[in-house]
Amino acid sequence: MDNYTWHSGTLIPSDSPSSIDRSQLYLEILGVLSVVYLLQTLVAYSKSFKAPFVGFRFWYEPKWLVGLRFSQGALAQVNEGYAKYKNAMFKVARNDSDILVIPNKYVEELRSLPDEKISAIRAHIKNLLGKYSTTLILLESDLHTRMLQTKLTPNLGSFIEVIESELLFAMDQEIPANLDDWQSVNVFHIVLRIVARISARVFLGVPACRNEEWLQTSIHYTENVFATVMLLRRFPKWMHPIVGHLLPSYWAIHRNLRTAKRIISPMVRQRRAEEAKRNPDYVKPNDLLQWMMDGANENDGQPDKLAHRQLLLSLASIHTTTMAAAHCFYDLCQHPEYFEPLREEINDVIAQDGGWKKTTLNKMRKLDSFLKESQRINPPSLLAFNRIVSEDLTLSDGTLLPKGTHFSMPSAAILQDNGVEPGADQFDGFRYYKKRLNPEEANKHQFAMTDNNNLHFGHGKYSCPGRFFASNEIKIIMAHLLTDYEFKYPRGATRPRNLTADENLYPDPSARLLMRRRVVAPPQASITPQLVSA
């Protein structure tokens, strides 16, 4: 029987000249695309820094296959590279980019270099596939990071009461009421909602921080960006314009942005209208949005652009803070011997201070140590200090990094190296507390601090500008939840395994803990004490 195919509404033999011509054309197109791809790869390789790749199982294995394995096996690949080339450079093949991993012996000479030489912003945008995640606005200015550094961080002490006030409101809204006995809860989700509320209170003020549509938008924007980036990385760059527009998460990002503009842009216009009246009784709101309005130039100060930057702040703050806090709760339940010492410290410090004061959190050294150890074991990323070389760069030892090189440092492997941290393979919640008992190191080893070994927040000029705010958020949340509630794993359960996506690590958001109200009330000296039911 003859074989037939459908062509222009007619069944024709599949071996007819028309079918053969089309097959030949498809093969020729495929051949041309393959040659173009090969040439692009060879040209890119010829311009790149020569360093050994890790992750290859055999020398002729296609790089895209190694990159595909990197998506779920990055930990093994980075650790392999660190073990083989601890004080040298090596490469990992991520599907969208080869990343040069360099040792932290270069930190000091790189940490203060300007964007004109190595760019943290361009690396950040590249990691987020800026064209598809609405993050290209970061190239226009550093407005929001500048306001975090110059306005929020220096005034964090004055926001302690604001944060605690919003926390108590959020706990009332987000924590189940029937917790007199053990109940199964999703702690990740509870903390996520609390962090979103507190962040909105500091970034936007009242009543915007209570706007449910904004809370949902600020939470889902990050999830949509992450989904879009992870999916697009599985495809070659030339397919991104096609695949990107087919992803539901891509269109959800743009819906999130439209919603942000609809909610925040009128707030900006209303505030400016009030300022224009020159009413002596008008008091400017004390929040990040107002600081951005006051510090913006004509371009940055457009209402829609301010709204856009507020959305980017949620991308940088809500989920990262939530993940760090969730890791802490998972680690506490795995190591329950730390519950009581932490509660004792929290209660003692608050009692000594007569409530929450500007310096209260600084005195909770055991809590700070536990956060830092939890992050050491469960880092947000295997790689940190991400940069793209803006122009050919010669390092102090003569090493030449060509323009366009994407490099980072193996931040997780460094802190899990016994040569850097003795006993690194063991969880020691008070590791850094004990180090600070030495008077010469009393002000070192803090959660939000960075140094040549501790790179999770970056280091130098482009360290995370919101890390001190995030640290305060987590500590206040944990202080209240630990003194008000008890937590444990369900019978037979242990700490959930961390999830991975390329170099990113994150706690299992579906994990459940048992939670119940404590029968001992927190100290009555608290500014707004939360009474605990018997």
Swiss-Prot record:
<dbReference type="InterPro" id="IPR002403">
    <property type="entry name" value="Cyt_P450_E_grp-IV"/>
</dbReference>
<keyword id="KW-0472">Membrane</keyword>
<feature type="glycosylation site" description="N-linked (GlcNAc...) asparagine">
    <location>
        <position position="498"/>
    </location>
</feature>
<feature type="glycosylation site" description="N-linked (GlcNAc...) asparagine">
    <location>
        <position position="3"/>
    </location>
</feature>
<keyword id="KW-0408">Iron</keyword>
<dbReference type="InterPro" id="IPR036396">
    <property type="entry name" value="Cyt_P450_sf"/>
</dbReference>
<feature type="binding site" description="axial binding residue">
    <location>
        <position position="464"/>
    </location>
    <ligand>
        <name>heme</name>
    </ligand>
</feature>
<dbReference type="GO" id="GO:0005506">
    <property type="term" value="F:iron ion binding"/>
</dbReference>
<feature type="glycosylation site" description="N-linked (GlcNAc...) asparagine">
    <location>
        <position position="95"/>
    </location>
</feature>
<keyword id="KW-0349">Heme</keyword>
<keyword id="KW-0503">Monooxygenase</keyword>
<keyword id="KW-0325">Glycoprotein</keyword>
<dbReference type="InterPro" id="IPR001128">
    <property type="entry name" value="Cyt_P450"/>
</dbReference>
<protein>
    <recommendedName>
        <fullName>Cytochrome P450 monooxygenase AN1598</fullName>
        <ecNumber>1.-.-.-</ecNumber>
    </recommendedName>
</protein>
<dbReference type="GO" id="GO:0016020">
    <property type="term" value="C:membrane"/>
</dbReference>
<dbReference type="GO" id="GO:0016705">
    <property type="term" value="F:oxidoreductase activity, acting on paired donors, with incorporation or reduction of molecular oxygen"/>
</dbReference>
<keyword id="KW-1133">Transmembrane helix</keyword>
<comment type="function">
    <text>Bifunctional terpene synthase; part of the gene cluster that mediates the biosynthesis of the diterpene ent-pimara-8(14),15-diene (PD). Within the cluster, the HMG-CoA reductase AN1593 functions in the mevalonate pathway, which produces isoprenoid precursors. The geranylgeranyl pyrophosphate (GGPP) synthase AN1592 is needed in the formation of GGPP, the precursor for diterpenes. Lastly, the pimaradiene synthase pbcA performs the 2 cyclization steps that convert GGPP to ent-pimara-8(14),15-diene.</text>
</comment>
<feature type="transmembrane region" description="Helical">
    <location>
        <begin position="25"/>
        <end position="45"/>
    </location>
</feature>
<keyword id="KW-0479">Metal-binding</keyword>
<keyword id="KW-0560">Oxidoreductase</keyword>
<dbReference type="GO" id="GO:0019748">
    <property type="term" value="P:secondary metabolic process"/>
</dbReference>
<dbReference type="Pfam" id="PF00067">
    <property type="entry name" value="p450"/>
</dbReference>
<comment type="pathway">
    <text>Secondary metabolite biosynthesis; terpenoid biosynthesis.</text>
</comment>
<dbReference type="GO" id="GO:0020037">
    <property type="term" value="F:heme binding"/>
</dbReference>
<dbReference type="GO" id="GO:0016114">
    <property type="term" value="P:terpenoid biosynthetic process"/>
</dbReference>
<dbReference type="GO" id="GO:0004497">
    <property type="term" value="F:monooxygenase activity"/>
</dbReference>
<keyword id="KW-0812">Transmembrane</keyword>
<comment type="similarity">
    <text>Belongs to the cytochrome P450 family.</text>
</comment>
